[in-house]
Amino acid sequence: MMDRRGFLKNATLVSAACLMDFREALALGAKDAEVGKAWKGWKKGQFQIHLIYTGVSESMFLIFPDGTTMLLDCGDHNAIGRGKLAVPVLPNPDRHAGEWISRYVLRVNPQKDYVDYMMLTHYHSDHGGNNKFYARKETRDGKDYYLSGFSQAAEYLTFGKAFDRCWPDYNDPLPLTQEAADAFEHMKDFYDYMLAHKKMEIEKFRLGETNQIAMRKDAAAYPGFSVRNICANGRIADKEGNIRDLYAERKKSNPVKFSENGMSLGVIFTY
C-alpha cells in the first residue's frame, strides 16, 4: 500500500505530466494555420465538434460525417446570483443561454433549424435548464411552462429525437425527486410538451450499444464512424459489452439519492 508521502509524490508527477501535455497541446494549437481564421463551414466527410461556451451552460453541437446533427446539453442557471462565484453570461447578458446556443446552431448547422438528436447528459440546470431561472414563463396545456435551456432552444430549433438517461419512469437507479428535483420537473414538462406537440421521439439511452446514436443520412459511406454508449446511471460498459455498476456497494445501504454528476451519460466517438 502506498504511504502518504509516496501518494503526494506520484500525484505531483502526474499533475506535472498533465500540465506539460496541456502546454504542448496549446503550443500545437497556436501553430495551426487555421487558428484565428473565419470558420469555413462543414463539408461532407468531416466530423465536427463545436463547444459552445456561454459561461452559464454546458453545450456541444456535433455534425457527423454524413450531416447528422446532435445538440449535447443546453442549460441555463443563475450564475450571476452566486455572488463572488458569479460567472458572466457570454457573449453578453442580453439573451439567455438557450437562445445564444440556438443562434449559434442556426449559423453552423447544415440543416438550418433541424437537429436530428438532442441529449441531456444528466439532470443539472447548467446542462438542461430549470423552472427557477428562465427567459419567459408561459401557460401551455393548462400549466406553467418555462423557457430555459433546452426548452428555450426548442423555440428556435426542431429536434427529431432525444436520448435521456432514465426516461420514461425517471427512477434509474433512484427516483429523481431529491438530488435534481428542479431540473427533473423542468425536463419532464419539456419532454411531455415535445411529445404532444412537436412529434419529437424520446428513447432511453441504452448502455453498451453502438448503433443507437447512428448516422441517419448516409451511414454506409462512413463505415469507420461509430458512437458507443459507455456510461449511464453509475454504470459503465466495456467494448465487449460487459457492464459494471460503480454504485453496487452504495446501493446496499438504501440511499435516497446519488450525485447527478455520477449518473452522467457518456459516449466514445470513433472515426
Give names to the regions the model predicted:
Residues 19-20, 83, 132:
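Alpha-helical transmembrane segments and their juxtamembrane interfaces
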Residues 39-113, 261-271:
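Conserved beta-strand hairpin/beta-sheet module of binuclear metal-dependent hydrolase folds
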